[in-house]
Every structure is written in C-alpha cells, then in structure tokens.
Amino acid sequence: MFKPLLSAELFFNWTAKDFKDKTSFLKQACRVLQDKNCIKEEQIALTALKEREAQITTGIMSKLALPHMQSATVLKPFVAVFKVNNVDWQSLDNQPVKLIFLIGVPKDQGNLHLEFISQFSKLMLQDEFANKVPNIRSFNGLINLIDSFQQTAVASQPVVNEAAAQTEEPKDTNTQYDFVAVTACPTGIAHTFMAKEALEKFARDHNLKVKVETQGTDGIQNQLTESDLNNTKGIILACDRLIDLTRFYGHANVVEVSTTKAIKTPQTVYDQVVKKEGKLLGNKSSDSASQTELKETTEQLSFKDFHKRIYRAILSGVSYMLPFVVFGGILIAIAFLIDINNAGNAGKQFGSKDPIANWFKTLGGLSFGLIVPILSAYIAFALVGRQGLLPGFIVGLISAGKFLLNIDIVTGKIDWATESKVSSGFFGAIFGGLLAAVLIIVQQRYIYRKLPQALQGIKNILFIPLLGTLVTAALFWVINIPLIYLNYGLSKFLQIMDKPYLAPLLGLVIGLMMCFDLGGPVNKAAYVFGVVSLESQNSGTVAMASAILSGMVPPLGIAIAATIRKQCFDKEELPAAYACYVMGLSFISEGAIPFVAKRPKIMLAANLIGGAVCGVLTGAFALTIRAPHGGVFVFALLKTNLEGIAGNTLQIGAGVGLALLALIVSSFISAGIIIGHNLLVVRKKTKQLVNTNA
C-alpha cells in the first residue's frame, strides 16, 4: 500500500505557526524539505507546486490538502505531513485546511504519487475517516487511523465493484451499467482519482453497477470498451481538460461535468443521468469526416474568448512552421557551402551554379516556400480545428504570391488577371488564418445550423470545404492588397535598419529578445522577425545574424563559466554545463533553461547583457547571414557589409572572423557575470561565518 511513503521524520506539527495563505506555507515547507534532503532547490520546488495549484486547487475537502509535484529537483519519493492551524487553501468546500500531505516524486521515477492519491482517495470517501483524519496530532495516530480504515475498506469491498472494475466486455451483452464514466483533470493526478473514487463510492452506496475510466498521468486505466458504451444508461464525462470524444459520438445521454462536481455532488450528477438530461454527441453517420471530427468542440467553433485564443493560435502556427524553416534553411545553407568555390563570381547564382548545390537549394526552397501557407493553415487549425486547414492553407498560398493579382507598388496599378509577383508574407498569413477561422465559425453557427438533418452529413465534406473556402479565398484576394503594401513597408524598414547607423540598435533589440525567455514567446518573436527579414529581402540580413549569434550566447556563457570556475554550479550540474558548448555552437538556446530556472536572477542578467552585447556587435560589424538556423555550422554563409571590405570572398572571410569575435566577447561577458556573482556569494558567506565565529 502507500504507507512506506510516510515517515515520522517528515511529520511536522506546525499548529503554532501562522500562515496567511497557502503560498506562505509552501515557501516554508520547501525550505524544510531542502534541509531534509528531499529536494535540491527550494525555489524550483516552490514554482512546481504553485504551477500545480494554479491549475486547480489541491484542497480536497474535509480540511485536507494534497499538494504534489513531479520534478527533477525531487531527490527521492516522499510524503511530508503537516499539521497546521486553519490555512486558507481555496479548497473545493471553501473550508480552511488543517492537515496537508505534500507529495514529491522525481521526474524520472514511477507513479508512486498516483498510488498514494488513489489509495488515500478511497479512504477519504469513508465519512468517518474524513471526519477523524484532520484531527490527528501525531505520526503514530495517523498510521493507526489508516490501518484501521484500510482493513475496513478491504473487508467491505463489494462484489459488484469487482465486476465493474473489469476491463473486458460483459459476457451478457444485454446486461447494462447504470452509468459509465471518464475522469480527467489537467495534471491527471488528484482530482482524476478523487472523482473516480467519489463516483464508485456513490455506486456502492446505492447498489449501482458502474465502470469508471481514468485518464491520468499514467495513461488510460480501466478503459471503456464499445460494448460498455452500448450497454449503459448514461455516460458521465467528469473532465477538466479536453479529451478525445470520438468514441462517444452517436451515444445519447452524455453528461459533461467538472471533476469538482463529481467529487462534491455525485448524487446530482447521477440524477442527470436518470432524468436523461445528457446530450447526444456528434452523430453516428458512416461519413468518415463526421467520425473524425474530434476536439472540435462547441466552444472551439464559437466566438467565446476568441480574442484570447488568437495569441496561442499564432504561437501554435509558428511551432508548426519552424520545422519547415529549419529544414529548408539548412538545405539552402548546405547548397551555399557546396557552391563556396563560386562565391566570388557566381553573383545571384551563388548556391545553384554547382549541380549538387542546385539540388539542395531547390529542395530547401520548396520547404522554405511553404512556411507562409503552413503558418496560415495552422493558425486557423488552432482556432477552429481541422476545418480551418484547407481555407487557411489556400489563403496562405495567396499570401505567398502563388495566385493572380499583381500590383505595381510604385504606381499602385493593379492587374487582377496576372500572376502575382508580390506577396503579403507573414502579415497575410496571420490575417488570412484569422479570417479563415472567423468564416468557419460563421458558417457553422449561423449559416448551416438549420440545414435539414439529411444534409448534415455532407455539410462538413462538401459545403464548408468547397463553398467556405471559395468565399474565404475571394474575400482575402481583395483584403490582401493593403497587406501587400504592409509587407512592402516592412521590407523597406528592414533595409533602413540594415544601414550602419541603425544596425546596432536593431541588433540590441533582437539580442535582448532572443535571450529573454529562451524558446518562449519573446524569443520566438525575435527569431520569426529574423526569418521574415530573410523572406522579405531574399538575402542575408543583420536581423537574422543577430538572432542566431545572440541565441548562442546563453549556453556558451554557462559552459565557459563552468570551465573557468566549477564552483559556480553543483557537482551534478557540471556535465550539463559542459554540454552547453555543443548546445550553444548548434544554436540551441534551450540548453540554458535548467540553469535559468534554478538561478533566475543572475542567469537572466548574464543572458540579457551577453545577448545585448552580441547583438550590438553584430550590427556594428554589419554582419548578415542567409541561413535561418545551424549555428556555427553555417558560419560560412556569414558576410560583412562594412565599408572598405569588397569582394564576396573577402566579405565572407571577414564576416566569419568578426562573428567569432562578437560571439567570444559576449559569451565571456556572460560567463564573467556568472563567475563574479558566485565569487560575491562565496565572499558573503565567508564573511558571515567569520562574524559568527567571532
């Protein structure tokens, strides 16, 4: 059972302490757990626990809380028990907490925390246990209470629940469950199992035959079969997160509630099943399109919180786009490297004069040419599901200039029937993806809503893909005109910023952004801006060079600091710190994330200062690069446009040398800040020790 996780050493009576809220408790608890060698870093543990609490409270009623974490900072599995005096935990029943079980499991170990929560949930659903456990005052009292009620629980386990717990299909296909259920919460831990136990206890108390599936961090357990779904009076989905609804399509009386409601009022939930207040999910049409419309929920196909979803949709589109950028960009970089002998005389044909180089450049160009359509398609997909893919991709192709309508930017003359030679680029992709999503929602909610039932089956395979995409493309064809001018303006802006007197400022901004959150939205925005500059100018740019070189600084600074002064890091961190040489040289900024998470203040300062210096030097040296990724492996594609350096070969050679200089200087500055901070900390501790001994 779960008792081996409990120990007298980790039982704390803190009734004399006063905590204004759960955050103040967690801070002190993490400090004690670090002293007990349960965790490595109290700040990381505190962050993990606070993030879990932000999803849904772990105050489970009966004046108990089960905060938990699975983190690399946990050294060994543990359950620490804290007896406290009425801590406000924002619990499900709005009652203050008197007893706290704080659970920690290492990142790479099993699911002991799940077993504890599952077993403890069963005990908590016994009213007498729930009433007694908050009042225990000692470790032995807790163990004795658990022992007595575990024996009771085993002795009273009903046969009907054993049958319900079987995953195989019933032998008698006419035998019905009173209800079947699925439970799932954002973390897949406490509330998932609490809801399961609450529903099963309710069934036992009322002599009902049930089966409950859990979708937790250990995967799907006790999975419902098609036979189970066909032989039940109702289906309860007690879920706080999105799950795959496909297998429930065509089944009636589906009741959707939160895990909290299932835990607190299972009677009310069951009454909904009895009164047949559940709904019919989807339909059981044989059309494959109807059967595969999973995750396109009512909320998704509506304008509810649409403005809040736009930001996440754009980031989602960027994440789908990046593999095309990296693949295409690196192949183009390889083409330039193969064709390096022709760098001095190939002119605009550089990278394609050699047949093999031309093969790589053409293939890379195919991938690179898809980044705008992919971005648009997956922005629409993130907002409305797969119905947004087709119109999103089409408007993305129009944005990329793959359709009719050519504009003379200077005169403003429009030729509607000529193949386009201009594009709206990323502006068109973002606006087009949003437009496609909006029109899909309008069609689903307001136009095709009242179609006869006989036509509903072909709505999603004919009306929306055909007519909807035609309308979207026609509207965007016209709307795209101002977006083309906007993209042209960006191109001109980038050309201005590449000038010697402004390039350092551009490098400074991009350098700071690249090193701010290391793979987060600010970092991605800076990187995408660099990619946009390549797409807009069709040549190497200062923006792209600044993004790549600055993004290499954080991991390199860490590696250099570890090499010069090992004491800057814990012994177990040193291998990862040395590995940052490879990470940094490969332009993988995320290699620095574990170190930033552990020492956020000093590491962020070192990263930002190092990145800013690198960006300024990149701009001052007028460095440009044609590849969007690759780190040191694409340095041969660097050039400098400094005055006085003429000729392609000399520009490349000087560009590589100046880039190495900028990278080395900024990385050593970053490392120096880390080392300096460590020396100050050691000096401060030494001084305190001397004063104490004195």
UniProtKB/Swiss-Prot annotation:
User: Which residues, renumbered to this chain, carry the PTM Phosphocysteine?
Assistant: C185
Please report the organism this UniProt entry assigns to the protein.
Mycoplasma pneumoniae (strain ATCC 29342 / M129 / Subtype 1) (Mycoplasmoides pneumoniae)
Q: What is its EC number?
A: 2.7.1.202
Intracellular or extracellular location(s): Cell membrane
Native organism taxonomy: Bacteria, Bacillati, Mycoplasmatota, Mycoplasmoidales, Mycoplasmoidaceae
Task: Give the protein's function.
Answer: The phosphoenolpyruvate-dependent sugar phosphotransferase system (sugar PTS), a major carbohydrate active transport system, catalyzes the phosphorylation of incoming sugar substrates concomitantly with their translocation across the cell membrane. This system is involved in fructose transport.
For this chain, one GO molecular function annotation is: kinase activity
Phosphoprotein as a keyword of this entry, yes or no, is yes
Protein's recorded name: PTS system fructose-specific EIIABC component
Q: What class of enzyme is it?
A: transferase
Show where the PTS EIIA type-2 domain sits.
4-149
